[in-house]
Amino acid sequence: MLKLLLGDPNARKLKRYQPIVTDINILEEDIALLSDDQLRSKTADFRQQFENVVSFPKQRVLLDELLPEAFAVVREAAKRVLGMRHFDVQLIGGMVLHEGQIGEMKTGEGKTLVATLPSYLNALTGRGVHVVTVNDYLARRDAEWMGQVHRFLGLSVGLIQQDMSPAERRRNYACDITYATNSELGFDYLRDNMATDLSEVVQREFQYCVIDEVDSILIDEARTPLIISGQVERPQEKYQQAADVAAALERAAEQGKDGIDPEGDYEVDEKQRSCTLTDEGFAKAEQNLKVRDLFDPADPWAHYITNALKAKELFVRDVNYIVRDGEAVIVDEFTGRVMPGRRWSDGQHQAIEAKEQLAIQPETQTLASITYQNFFLLYPRLAGMTGTAKTEEVEFEKTYKLETSVIPTNQPRARADWVDQVYKTESAKWRAVANETAEIHKQGRPVLVGTTSVEKSELLSSLLSEQEIPHNLLNAKPENVEREAEIVAQAGRAGAVTIATNMAGRGTDIILGGNSDYMARLKLREVLLPRLVRPEEGHRPPVPLQRAAETGGGFAAKAAASNGSHGHVLSEARAIGSLYPCSLTDDTDQFLAELARELVKVWGDRALSVIELEDRISTAAEKAPTDDAQIAALRESIARVKTEYDVVVTQEEVRVREAGGLHVIGTERHESRRVDNQLRGRAGRQGDLGSTRFFLSLEDNLLRIFGGERVASLMNAFRVEEDMPIESGMLTRSLEGAQKKVETYYYDIRKQVFEYDEVMNNQRRAVYAERRRVLEGRGLKKQVIGYGERTMDDVVEAYVNPDLPPEEWDLDQLVSKVQEFVYLLEDLKPEQLQGLSMEELKSFLQEQLRNAYDIKEGQIEQQRPGLMREAERFFILQQIDTLWREHLQAMDALRESVGLRGYGQKDPLIEYKNEGYDMFLEMMANMRRNVIYSMFMFQPAPAPAQEAANV
């Protein structure tokens, strides 16, 4: 009713962009007449206008003035290079992003293409633009795909990947537009602020950032800070002993069922993700370990036992982590991908290694950390896009000061969201999922099933294999990760069945009928790899093809002969047939064979790396002009294969549309309604037909942990068969209530993480600013003398009480302390200070320090010119890093301890702020004092006589 009276505020907001859209459309005709070179020269024209405009505010005014023409130029370039033209609604999306807002754009509406508009415009300043995605695969895809537009227009495009060297990172960050993941950006920022030389710094000053899947990065991942750790020595045998004790302890029943304390050795709170020993548990653990007290400071055990219990109860193999090559590798809870190299902190990872009987790696200590909230707030202008932002609008506004605008779809939505089916037990739910998948598959429609863990995806895979339903599995297991792009390329084909772990975070569109462009590139890769790639690199064809080759082509026959006992094998064999839409004609096969021979002559026989070949195929897939004959030949081959595949893919697309489009099945409600909506959004892209349904059970984690007593009573109330779905308004309300409860719960956690990290953030920025000044070598001598002057002030204030008469001041102690710091003042006598006021004392000692420092500098510089500045930089960085590391530990300990002060009617956050501030001031004072002491004690070794080389 309010909307009818006042109008839709979002529509009113978007209406102001319409005149600019009209301007861009008017410019389109003139810009279409330009040649490629003339279009490219527009970039230089735009950039010239920024030559004398250096301040951020003035640059923003100029960017706004250039927007209509710049957007028209990008639209024309995208038409020529990608064959894609920005719709009017995409232009509006680009304006929303340019203004530093969050644009909600439904799945399939071309978010990736929209990002080219503001990223090009803001790159014209020369300050650099970061486009952020959730994983390396998407960053690479977008840099290759959308980067074509920017490269065509004369901008440089960089890409940051996990395994890059610092030199490669520096080169890529120096580009006009850099594609990277949120974690790589954050860790590079932390590493830059641990660098000991300016040449080690890879990032430049932040300017503008566009985040794809912004809710995933700024909301879902905001609970976990980015941490860089260093190793610390701890007795490793304790982890294994603790794991053995934990295995022997028994979990208590749920708390408070009959008002009686639970029996058992420890309690588990899944909501808080914590384990607590009972009195019996403490006694049993102490008895097993033969110790008197688990908290004995000389031999502490409590921390080890708690971590071992959490490893046993809360960290599940193939859900939270997988075991690969003798290591426990974390699985990202939001994307379902493995995160090699990442480890849980505080001894938790070691506890999991002990549980799994793996080699235990050394424990780590935090060297640097930051939350995503505070990291992204470092950008002067931040923007983001996602399919689902409106549900988190308040949090975006409060935490990040980001407005949210909903961009209208280009075509009306035609997706049907079918009613949820709820089952009493989990096993009944999975049988129902398998049955619906089989039914939809028979109709010739593609099916995407979203699961929440590796374990669940493999359970469903085995159920489908029993029914001989061919399917592809996409989860964190290594053999499946390697096939991600290939699986997604096929997921929209007629009858295709894809099981994906956390598909919501994968950011990849599923095209009805299949992606002929990618399949053509895959075919070319398959033909060229054995001829062009070095043998040690390996040239594995796509996984199912390789397995078929290993069995001499009788894969399906052998599986069939086994009377269904190898259902999974048969399922994969059938999936092989769907890898490519059709066989190529003999002419095209011969054409590809001839191409391989010609490329061997130019590039060498098996002389390339896999990455080099893939880069060349990616370049060939672009539409930008090329003078390279080999790239042109590759491009012709891709086009030829794609043309043949298109015939079948187009027919399949028609069949799939007629059958009803993609069907998406959710197998569990996520903790957030937004993530459920992301999964639904995979179906019905750009006005396509499609449908979705969620299958749930009363045993699902969400209902079990957050549903409370109401769900428990419902389980007893429903006296129906296991295989009968339950439909109940009361149950639906319980479900929505549970989701709202968990959303509020996690919002409070994120808010608390942010509030506490805000205290650290102010300190971090001060320390990192000091470090950067030192790295850049700006006024080092002046800075150290400033440290010395403040140290002299500290000494005076410590030993002189202004409330006492001057004759009672302990000047002997004061002089002794000054000489501890500055041994060159050994001739200073207390008599020289008599009769001076407190301020005069400070001034006198500061002058003495400056004179002593000049003498010290003369001594050091005699050894080697420039050595004094090197020593200053070394000692300042050494002290900052050492004391900051200790300060981080102290702040962690403070944060844990202030929680108890709530019982004393004190606000823990205010206590943390006040005490943390005092600790920070003390740390900075210690840093200044230690630097002064180190500088005066510094005695460089004489340079050794140069020996003749005897090599």
Swiss-Prot record:
SUPFAM superfamilies: Helical scaffold and wing domains of SecA, P-loop containing nucleoside triphosphate hydrolases, Pre-protein crosslinking domain of SecA
Oligomer and partners: Monomer and homodimer. Part of the essential Sec protein translocation apparatus which comprises SecA, SecYEG and auxiliary proteins SecDF. Other proteins may also be involved.
Functional description taken from the UniProt entry: Part of the Sec protein translocase complex. Interacts with the SecYEG preprotein conducting channel. Has a central role in coupling the hydrolysis of ATP to the transfer of proteins into and across the cell membrane, serving as an ATP-driven molecular motor driving the stepwise translocation of polypeptide chains across the membrane.
Organism: Prochlorococcus marinus (strain MIT 9303)
Localization annotation: Cell inner membrane; Cellular thylakoid membrane; Cytoplasm
Protein name: Protein translocase subunit SecA
Primary subcellular site in the record, as a coarse category: membrane
PROSITE patterns linked: SECA (PS01312), SECA_MOTOR_DEAD (PS51196)
GO MF terms, alphabetically ordered: ATP binding; protein-exporting ATPase activity
Membrane-topology annotation of the record: Peripheral membrane protein
Recorded superkingdom: Bacteria
NCBIfam families recorded: secA
UniProt entry keywords in alphabetical sequence: ATP-binding, Cell inner membrane, Cell membrane, Cytoplasm, Membrane, Nucleotide-binding, Protein transport, Thylakoid, Translocase, Translocation, Transport
Enzyme Commission number(s) from the entry: 7.4.2.8
Gene Ontology, cellular component aspect: cell envelope Sec protein transport complex; cytosol; plasma membrane-derived thylakoid membrane
Gene Ontology biological process terms in this record: intracellular protein transmembrane transport; protein import; protein targeting; protein transport by the Sec complex
Main EC class the enzyme belongs to: translocase
The reaction(s) this protein catalyses: ATP + H2O + cellular proteinSide 1 = ADP + phosphate + cellular proteinSide 2
Residues that, per the record, bind ATP: Q90, G108, E109, G110, K111, T112, D509
Family of the protein in this entry: Belongs to the SecA family.
Any Pfam family matching the protein: SecA_SW
